[in-house]
From Swiss-Prot:
Protein name per the record: Endonuclease V
Membership in a protein family: Belongs to the endonuclease V family.
Keyword field contains DNA damage: yes
Cofactor names: Mg(2+)
Amino-acid positions noted as binding Mg(2+) in the UniProt annotation, renumbered to this chain: D34, D102
Keywords: Cytoplasm, DNA damage, DNA repair, Endonuclease, Hydrolase, Magnesium, Metal-binding, Nuclease
Length: 222
């Protein structure tokens, strides 16, 4: 039986170790990380795509598949996802200076989403780039690209609600580890190329999902 109380207590303890200020040099390699599931959840799949900066060209990618170690439990998703992320991380020849994770960082009820959890374990600066809100509230967001509002939870800012593209739902940007909230938003902005997602997590999602466009791009950039 899974001791969810112990896992929540572990989250609270690990959240105290998260560094919420800039602790990195200007990155030359920036990665995106994405996690999915296969065989009705029996297999966890993690993809990490490493891009050069500022060109944002693919340098390396790795995919790891492992047996799923934990069922889906709301608020404890990082325990389900980090083992595959760490497996993919270990496969990388070129370790990135900054990683954007498809998921939340400190924008989490106990301030430890998958971006923060992975950042702590890998000791790498990370940013949470999530497609859906997990907790917190914000003021009404403008429709124009670049519109931004603080994401607040009990008067504490835990992230940004940021509209990256017109007529698209916003992204939820947060500190993962070793980066400030302001810098997290800045670096996501710097990795945009006109799509809803930054190139980092767009590549990771495309590779993990075997999308035809990314397969063609990989063939051109072996």
């Amino acid at each position: 039986m899974i001791n969810t109380k112990a896992l929540r207590q572990e989250q609270i303890a690990k959240a105290q170790q998260v560094i919420c200020y800039d602790d990195f040099s200007p990155p030359k390699l920036i990665a995106g990380a994405d996690v999915g599931f296969e065989r009705q959840g029996a297999i966890t799949r993690a993809a990490i795509a490493v891009l050069s900066y500022p060109a944002l060209e693919l340098v390396e990618y790795q995919i790891a598949r492992i047996e799923t170690t934990l069922p889906y439990i709301p608020g404890l998703l990082s325990f389900r996802e980090y083992p595959a992320l760490m497996a993919a991380w270990q496969l990388l020849k070129y370790k990135p200076d900054l990683v954007m994770v498809d998921g939340h960082g400190i924008a989490h009820p106990r301030r430890l989403g998958v971006a923060s959890h992975f950042g702590l374990l890998a000791n790498v600066p990370t940013i949470g780039v999530a497609k859906r809100r997990l907790c917190g509230e914000s003021e009404l967001l403008g429709e124009q690209p670049g519109s931004c509002q603080p994401l607040l939870d009990k008067e504490e800012q835990i992230g940004w609600v940021w509209r990256s593209k017109k007529r698209c739902n916003p992204l939820y940007i947060s500190t993962g580890h070793r980066i400030s909230l302001d810098s997290a938003l800045l670096w996501v902005e710097r990795c945009m190329k006109g799509y809803r997602l930054p190139e980092t997590t767009r590549w990771a999602d495309g590779i993990a999902s075997n999308r035809p466009f990314f397969e063609q791009m990989i063939q051109k950039n072996p």
